[in-house]
Curated annotation (Swiss-Prot):
Role, per record: Plays an essential role in the initiation and regulation of chromosomal replication. ATP-DnaA binds to the origin of replication (oriC) to initiate formation of the DNA replication initiation complex once per cell cycle. Binds the DnaA box (a 9 base pair repeat at the origin) and separates the double-stranded (ds)DNA. Forms a right-handed helical filament on oriC DNA; dsDNA binds to the exterior of the filament while single-stranded (ss)DNA is stabiized in the filament's interior.
The UniProt record lists the keyword Isomerase: no
GO molecular function: ATP binding; ATP hydrolysis activity; DNA replication origin binding; lipid binding
Keyword Ribonucleoprotein on entry: no
Residue numbers spanned by region Domain III, AAA+ region: 124-340
Protein name, as recorded: Chromosomal replication initiator protein DnaA
CC terms in the record's Gene Ontology section: cytoplasm; plasma membrane
PANTHER family: CHROMOSOMAL REPLICATION INITIATOR PROTEIN DNAA
Gene3D superfamilies for the chain: 1.10.1750.10, 1.10.8.60, 3.30.300.180, P-loop containing nucleotide triphosphate hydrolases
Domain notes: Domain I is involved in oligomerization and binding regulators, domain II is flexibile and of varying length in different bacteria, domain III forms the AAA+ region, while domain IV binds dsDNA.
Amino acid sequence: MQATNPIWAEVQQSLQKTLSKPSFETWIRPAKFNCFENGLLTLIAPNTFSSDWLRKNYCETIEKAAKEICGHDVKVVFKSETNTSSDLSNEDKANEKNVHHKTRSFSSNNQNNSSKNQFKNPNGLNLRYVFKRFVVGPNSRLAHAAALAVAESPGREFNPLFICGGVGLGKTHLMQAIGHYRVEIDPEAKVKYVSTETFTNDVISGIRRDGMTAIRDKYRNVDLILIDDIQFLEGKEYTQEEFFHTFNALHESGSQIVIASDRPPNQLSGIQERLISRFSMGMTADIQPPDLETRTAILQKKAEQERMSLPRDLIQFIAGRFTSNIRELEGAFTRAVAFASITGLPMTVQSIAPMLDPNSVGVVVTPKQVINKVSDFFKVSTDELISSSRRKPVSQARQIGMYLMRHGTDLSLPRIGDEFGGKDHTTVMYAIEQVEKKLSIDPNIASQVQKIRDLLQIDSRKNL
């Protein structure tokens, strides 16, 4: 296989001008030249999935560009690196209109039109979650390619698209990027992003108010539905029943369904087998934790987006320290920048490292500091915090306060109980266990705890 070829290089340059950047970078750039003989251009795709998608959606576009450059008809065939024989024939090419080629006529001005689409912002699409902000690595390449394929040609081959992976790896980002890209291509598209919790609450509300007809219209009258955290359907029998019929209605109408979960369909528990079967009938793409190179690239891209300048050794330190997920990685970046900005300390590994300790407050603080900071953060009075109130906002703040006092001071459990109005040491132990349990499953709690830790760090260092 030749490393380069002037004909293919010119074709790529031509396509780069006519295709969107995500499409070009995902499908065209990775394709390698194999040979060009007797008007037959053979290209090598990274895998069978890519070669199939190129053949069905870009073959005609590539042939047209090659003809303009060569001055005669050119036929294109695709092979994959994992399969050296030619992939599927081109016999269906004439019947498969190139959806992507048709939709490229939409200019960037459609961004203004799409903002008028009632299904965009009202349905929770975060403007930051777009394809151009997603860093693709070996851990996410297949999921990214599948997401882009669905965004370009919804309701066709990968329906449903089931994206799975651990917490904070980019599932929600990819899902919402599909929605944004689809609306950019087709401003009239009805796109809806919803969490499973919201869907469940809507079903419950519909039952109570005898309004299920309106709920069904809300979820079934869409072109593209993006459903996050489907694992939370576990044990909810009536909601599962309603979702089963919603899924069927959408699928039968040709609407695209995209589902995200923290595990693949065959590992979901407490969910009806008929739903599991439907989740598995399309394509399942998983996202793994990013490797060091990808984590470094993510931090560099975030620094560029935020117009921040971080020393390379600090970026490498953060990338090497936070390995489990992207949310944690970006959170560390944000804390480092905020800490340096507020304290005036230099952006060095030595000054930032204590702040990034994920297991402790990092400096010794007083019980009064913890109580005051927790009180300020949750907007509850210190009297309420140390009272016996069982109101959820107060009890949750109290539990977090006990957890932080345990990890930020040298007080024993009974002493911590005394600081919180004379609580028994078993109450303190229970509170700490509850917070530790929630830290691994509730991103909101984890974020709250980390923010208070950071505030305690900053206050303590100001007093040094």
